């Protein structure tokens, strides 16, 4: 499979901090708490744009950071939420988390959206914590940190046009003269063993992706040579360009080559023959090519287009490229297996996700107890340690989660050091 890959870093926006404030207005005694909530940060969202064909843009920009939410304000005013950072990607992009190997998203349809990095929610202001027992709380929350990830983008590049033909008929040479692709070219068979892709400009503002695929031989549909590898590539294309050596320079008969290739395509997948074919009579600059072309045309249907060219002398190329572009405009995508696709649409996939514990405790060689876990780390980062009331609330939350009891069971005693992220504190029994 011809795959474009690139690694990037994404960071969603942090939530804004909540505020501790009180209402102080003339003639309003005991105004009460009036600290607003912080705004939500911005998600990093990938959106499919059918106009994009490659991941080349990501090779010049690899870091994407979304904006943070605004902090809460006095007079119970909430901070503004940040607008999502929208990143456009081509159809067929797969997004993987590099650290876990998880497939985050498989983006296949135009306009499809996926949140790649989730923003942090805004912290609550002190107005949210008012209770009858504590009508004037002096505590607030920090904004939740936004998610950050190192991700790998993989694009299974879908070629619009596939060049088919026996080895050494001139497929690589043709691709090299109509695009910026530079495939290996030599006068021996199987020079091309992996697909080469080129972006082709038809010369009238239209463009398409052409693939020079490994040479096909008889028996390919049964896996002979590079058969199955070749045919898996060609089934993803919309138009097949059949390149034939019309000079017969290696003792081959053009019409027999034409029939043999089509036979392999038909045996591998009947639907391959539904794709429109354009026949390219290559090497027309060679002796006997004209005579062979006349004989060839008498053996095929009159409505099958044949374009005589010479990839070496670059003659006949413009007419060929315009014809390919015209054919692409009227050719839809070909589903490989409609029954399978219908079954996929009706199938619900249930995935088991193990429940993550609230916290875990480990002990280092120096005796330090280390707390970790998504929930406990989120509580820590959202605690405003500049306020005594917030610190007391954090201690109560740990106690309610069972952290104190779990530390005692692990042997923690008064004065032992407990670490959570970069913060260390003493255990008090």
From Swiss-Prot:
Region feature Disordered, mapped onto this chain: 124-145
Domain of life of the organism encoding this protein: Bacteria
Binding site for Mg(2+): 172, 192
GO MF assignments: GTP binding; GTPase activity; magnesium ion binding
EC number(s) per entry: 3.6.5.-
Single biological process term from Gene Ontology: ribosome biogenesis
Binding site for GTP: 165-172, 190-194, 212-215, 282-285, 310-312
Main location class: cytoplasm
Keywords from the named record: Cytoplasm, GTP-binding, Hydrolase, Magnesium, Metal-binding, Nucleotide-binding
UniProt domain Obg: residue ranges: 1-158
Pfam families, alphabetized: DUF1967 (PF09269), GTP1_OBG (PF01018), MMR_HSR1 (PF01926)
CDD domains, sorted: Obg
Cofactors required: Mg(2+)
CC per GO annotation: cytoplasm
PROSITE patterns tied to this protein: G_OBG, GTP1_OBG, OBG, OCT
Compartment(s) of residence: Cytoplasm
Keyword Protein transport annotated: no
Function in brief: An essential GTPase which binds GTP, GDP and possibly (p)ppGpp with moderate affinity, with high nucleotide exchange rates and a fairly low GTP hydrolysis rate. Plays a role in control of the cell cycle, stress response, ribosome biogenesis and in those bacteria that undergo differentiation, in morphogenesis control.
PANTHER family, per the entry: DEVELOPMENTALLY REGULATED GTP-BINDING PROTEIN-RELATED, MITOCHONDRIAL RIBOSOME-ASSOCIATED GTPASE 2
HAMAP family: GTPase_Obg (MF_01454)
Family statement drawn from the similarity comment of this UniProt entry: Belongs to the TRAFAC class OBG-HflX-like GTPase superfamily. OBG GTPase family.
Subunit organization: Monomer.
Protein's name according to its UniProt entry: GTPase Obg
The organism of origin for this protein: Listeria welshimeri serovar 6b (strain ATCC 35897 / DSM 20650 / CCUG 15529 / CIP 8149 / NCTC 11857 / SLCC 5334 / V8)
Gene: obg
